[in-house]
Swiss-Prot record:
InterPro entries (UniProt xref): Ribosomal_bL12, Ribosomal_bL12_C, Ribosomal_bL12_C/ClpS-like, Ribosomal_bL12_oligo, Ribosomal_bL12_oligo_N_sf
SUPFAM superfamilies registered for this protein in UniProt: ClpS-like, Ribosomal protein L7/12, oligomerisation (N-terminal) domain
Function of the molecule: Forms part of the ribosomal stalk which helps the ribosome interact with GTP-bound translation factors. Is thus essential for accurate translation.
HAMAP family, per the entry: Ribosomal_bL12
Gene responsible for this protein: rplL
UniProt source species: Streptococcus agalactiae serotype Ia (strain ATCC 27591 / A909 / CDC SS700)
GO cellular component, one term: cytosolic large ribosomal subunit
Family to which the UniProt record says this protein belongs: Belongs to the bacterial ribosomal protein bL12 family.
Lineage: Bacteria, Bacillati, Bacillota, Bacilli, Lactobacillales
Protein name stated in the entry: Large ribosomal subunit protein bL12
Superkingdom of the source species: Bacteria
Keywords: Ribonucleoprotein, Ribosomal protein
């Protein structure tokens, strides 16, 4: 029996979603495997974080350049000097909740450039 990969691929392209679902189930049963295993492994390896749509930016430590970090915290939060200093002094503290991935990374870069340690949650 000759196996023609191109014919198999052509058949798969023409199949409906239901037919493909049945094919996957049949392959799983025949070979004792599961199609969900790679997805679970990817999620366990931290790729689930990439699927998040909102992040909390947490200041974990101010570092040596505390004054610069306070200025950046004021810029990000819109708080006054006293409030921004309290946030920095009481680290770890959340600077921004529910930020988009792009916004969270931008805030993280600004804080790290000022000398702070930051984590995204």
């Amino acid at each position: 029996m000759a196996l023609n990969i191109e014919n198999i691929i052509a058949e798969i392209k023409e199949a409906t979603i239901l037919e493909l679902n049945d094919l996957v189930k049949a392959i799983e049963e025949e070979f004792g495997v599961t199609a969900a295993a790679p997805v679970a492994a990817a999620a366990a390896s931290g790729e689930a974080a990439a699927a998040k749509d909102s992040f909390d930016v947490e200041l974990t430590a101010a570092g040596d350049k505390k004054v610069g970090v306070i200025k950046v915290v004021r810029e990000i939060t819109g708080e006054g000097l006293k409030e921004a200093k309290a946030i920095v002094d009481n680290a770890p503290s959340v600077i921004k909740e529910g930020a988009s991935e792009a916004e969270a990374n931008e805030i993280k870069e600004k804080l790290e450039a000022a000398g702070a340690s930051v984590t995204l949650k």
